[in-house]
């Protein structure tokens, strides 16, 4: 009985921790998509695709970096890899110019 209770408590704690991380990724991706949709004419489906892609990028980066004690160079390597993967994923739906504009607007959203 103690093992079941302990397992349940650990699962709830893990879900709570994961929800906090996802909240950051969700907020950041929502802000970026809001700016992107205000500047570019894209469909709701494309906006949803961009938001999900950016959310996955931010959440993945956080999982790879948080609590790992990585150096600045190692963090930059994680960010570069994620940026390349995101660019490739966006290229499946958008052309090169649109992808560059999306990335520029995403970066601009960090400053707001």
What is the meaning of each model-derived region?
Residues 1-24:
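Bacterial Sec-dependent N-terminal signal peptides
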Residues 20-112:
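Charge-rich (acidic/polar
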